Every structure is written in C-alpha cells, then in structure tokens.
Amino acid sequence: VQAMQEGLGESFVGTSNCSIAMKRDIEAIGTNAHELPMVYSALADSDEDLAMAPYQVLADWHEEHDGNLRIILPDTYGTEGFLKNAPDWLASWTGMRIDSGDPKASAKNAIKWWRSLGENPKEKLLIFSDGLDVNQILELHKQFSDEVNVSFGWGTNLTNDFRNLADGGRLDAFSLVCKAASANGRATVKLSDNPNKATGPVSEIKRYRRVFQVLSLIHISEPTRPR
C-alpha cells in the first residue's frame, strides 16, 4: 500500500483492508464479501427466503454504511438474475463491483440496469476486480471511462506478476480467498458468474441453481470445496 501511494499518487484511491486504511489514514473502499450472502442464504428456511437473502444482506448493510461502502457485489448467485430481481432502491447505491465472468459484458449490463431505473451511469462507479493486469486495466478504462466512473480492485497480479518466469509456473500467482463453509450446520453455496468458482455440495448447488435460475452449472457432478 505504501508503494502504491508513492507510485500512483492520486490514482491510488484507497484499500479494502480496513486495518491498513485506518493506520495510514486513507479511504476504506470496496464491498462486503461473498460470505455475507452465502451465510444469509444458508440460514434461509425456505426457497422464498433463499431467493430474498442476497437482497436482505444489502438492506441490512444499507442501514449501517453509506458512500464508498455502498458498492453492490451482485455475482454470488449470478449477476443476471440478481439485477433482474433487485429492488429499485438498490440502484441508488454508489456503484457496483465486477468480480467474475466477462468484465465487458458485465459492465454493459450494469450500465443498462442503471439507465433502466433512471440513474445516470456517469454518476456511478464500476469497480473491476477479477484477476486484473495492467493491460486489462488500460483496456477496460479506455472502453468504459466515458460512460461511467471506473476503478480497479487490483490485488493478485499487483503483488505477484511473475508469470512465465519459471518452469511449470512455479512463480505464478495463485488465488487465495476465504469463504464460509457452513452456517448453523448448513452448507454454504456460491455460484458466481464463472462456473469454475462454484462451491458447495452438489445437491445444494442444484437447488440454488433452480432458485436463482442459473443454468451455467449443469455439468457439475463432484462436490466442490470452498475457495
């Protein structure tokens, strides 16, 4: 973070690490994590409650946070269905984070969603955060910066961009994230916009696919571990 402050200057706008933000007196910016809707969903007692769980998370969050902490993370159970069924008040939030799937398609869908609800995308913030490198950042900025405010959650390839420098990918970065495995004895599930990121027991993944109308995970046949 210190290196980013010194190297990027005003282009470095904050960190999602609240401890570092407090110690360095910089902006805490980002989203709540996938764990929250995963836990709320695991605690749901019916399919109806399950379908509403991701929005209940944000309703509770709305009561406690504002400004740059009101960033929607829509992909826990598929962005398309999330936006289709989202309450209108959610469009008033500061922005949206794109963390899986095709970032360009997701950005276009976010802009379209805001416009459909009477919001001006030029007053909104899109945060791209899925395995970015410099070339992707430049390309996304060039394509979308005239339509919406763009920012980039740059982590994995920021601290380790040594790809193809050792045989067998021994220096390549790897993804290390924390996910809730269960809540009150019930397994948690994450679907994502990327089928490779799906986690949870197969039986529960099938149920969540049905409830959230996600069709991309039909070929999953083995239990997956949280990641």
PLM segments and residue spans:
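Buried, small/hydrophobic-residue-enriched core segments of structured protein domains
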Residues: 1-109, 114, 144, 182-186
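Glycine-rich phosphate-binding active-site loops on the catalytic face of alpha/beta enzymes
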Residues: 147-163
